């Protein structure tokens, strides 16, 4: 995996505190597997091994399937992770961002987002409400925004 050698080099030259992978499904596996689910499983396992080798967290962003669009409650679930159940299995933590306002223009929760902690190997799961600041495309602490 080319990424592993780059990370090793960066760690030796500068140190490394965290690795961020923007869009896991754009990566390709080393085996040239024709089955995309198996390939994503291989990638997921190699990311887990990379985190252990580099002794740092790896944050990997993943695309969801279209399943949330088909449900009345559009909140994403673990089963919505695209192309592989191994992402769900291998990850220590899985979090989703959700804004009801995106799907429901009449919502009472305008300017509110949710961080859904769907899996946390060493802790609780649940939902944390946050302020959505659309002008800056960012989330913020709900208490801080509403007290300012």
Describe the role of every protein-language-model region.
Residues 1-18, 28, 33, 45-55, ...:
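C-terminal regions of RecA-like/P-loop NTPase motor modules
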Residues 24:
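Conserved Walker B
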Residues 33-36, 40:
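A short, small/polar-residue-rich loop/turn motif at beta-strand boundaries
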């Amino acid at each position: 995996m080319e990424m592993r050698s780059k990370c090793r080099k960066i760690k030796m030259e500068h140190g490394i505190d965290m690795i961020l992978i923007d869009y896991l499904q754009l990566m390709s596996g080393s085996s040239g597997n024709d089955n995309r689910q198996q390939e994503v499983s291989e990638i997921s396992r190699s990311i887990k091994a990379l985190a252990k080798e580099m002794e740092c967290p790896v944050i990997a962003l993943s695309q969801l399937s279209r399943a949330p669009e088909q449900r009345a409650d559009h909140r994403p679930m673990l089963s919505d992770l695209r192309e592989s159940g191994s992402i769900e299995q291998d990850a220590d933590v899985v979090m989703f961002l959700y804004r009801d306002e995106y799907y429901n223009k009449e919502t009472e929760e305008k300017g509110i987002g949710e961080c859904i902690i769907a899996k946390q190997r060493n802790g609780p799961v649940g939902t944390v409400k946050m302020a959505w600041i659309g002008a800056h495309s960012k989330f913020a602490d709900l208490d801080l925004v509403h007290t300012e």
